[in-house]
């Protein structure tokens, strides 16, 4: 009654299998299916690593041939602290462009508003809160850049 197999249960098992697949052939078929699935999985993993974009096309990787030290300014409660971090120089940027990037600080850069306000002058970029389309009272609205001349705001 336990978990022992008797010869009658084996004969019953072999009689229920098709005549083309005996117990040893059935096991062999399962193993070959397992190896085919394993091979398919390995090929998928290899294809994933070979098809992914190179490091030069990623906007987050800053790889180059010449390495330089860069200064990064982190704002902390109204104070500006200098953090020295190893970075690599991208392409042939000039020192002024590198300095502008460092001094600009965190966040998005302001747009060029020279021709966005029409004939109105001076046209300056400003940060403005943008409420959502539906009327919702919130403590925080996301901010966006707009060009401002006088009391009017223009899309950059």
UniProtKB/Swiss-Prot annotation:
Phenotype when the gene is knocked out: No visible phenotype in wild-type background, but restores stomata to hypocotyls in a tmm background. Chal and cll2 double mutants are defective in growth, with a short stature, shortened pedicells and compact inflorescence.
Principal cellular location given in the protein's record: secreted
Disulfide bonds: 113-147, 117-123, 120-149
UniProt KW Amino-acid biosynthesis keyword: no
GO cellular component: extracellular region
Tissues where the protein occurs: Expressed in the internal layers of the root, hypocotyl and stems, and in the midrib of developing rosette leaves. Detected in a ring of cells surrounding the vascular elements. Expressed in developing stems soon after bolting, in inflorescence stems, near the root apex and in the chalazal region of ovules. Not found in cotyledons or in stomatal precursors or stomata.
Compartment(s) where it occurs, according to its Swiss-Prot or TrEMBL record: Secreted
Keyword Cell inner membrane: no
Signal sequence, renumbered to the chain: 1-47
InterPro entries per the UniProt record, alphabetical: EPFL
Keywords: Developmental protein, Disulfide bond, Secreted, Signal
Gene Ontology annotations of biological process type: guard cell differentiation; stomatal complex development
Family statement: Belongs to the plant cysteine rich small secretory peptide family. Epidermal patterning factor subfamily.
Oligomeric and partner information: Interacts with ERECTA.
Function text: Acts primarily as positive regulator of inflorescence growth. Endodermal expression is sufficient for proper inflorescence architecture. Redundantly involved with EPFL4 in procambial development regulation. Also acts as tissue-specific regulator of epidermal pattern. Controls stomatal patterning by repressing stomatal production. TMM (AC Q9SSD1) functions to dampen or block CHAL signaling. Not processed by SDD1 (AC O64495). Acts as growth-regulatory ligand for ERECTA family receptors.
Name of the protein this chain belongs to: EPIDERMAL PATTERNING FACTOR-like protein 6
Organism: Arabidopsis thaliana
Phylogenetic lineage: Eukaryota, Viridiplantae, Streptophyta, Embryophyta, Tracheophyta
Name of the encoding gene: EPFL6
């Amino acid at each position: 009654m336990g978990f022992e197999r008797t010869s009658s249960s084996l004969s019953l098992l072999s009689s229920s299998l098709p005549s083309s697949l005996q117990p040893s052939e059935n096991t062999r078929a399962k193993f070959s299916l397992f190896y085919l699935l394993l091979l398919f999985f390995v090929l998928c993993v290899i294809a994933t690593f070979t098809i992914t974009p190179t490091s030069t096309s990623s906007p987050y990787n800053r790889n180059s041939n010449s390495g330089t030290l860069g200064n990064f300014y982190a704002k902390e409660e109204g104070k500006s602290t200098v953090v020295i971090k190893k970075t690599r120089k991208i392409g042939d940027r000039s020192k002024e462009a590198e300095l502008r990037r460092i001094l600009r600080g965190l966040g998005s850069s302001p747009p060029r508003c020279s021709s966005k306000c029409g004939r109105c002058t001076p046209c300056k970029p400003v940060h403005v809160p943008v409420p959502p389309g539906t009327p919702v009272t919130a403590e925080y609205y996301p901010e966006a850049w707009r060009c401002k001349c006088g009391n009017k705001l223009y899309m950059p």
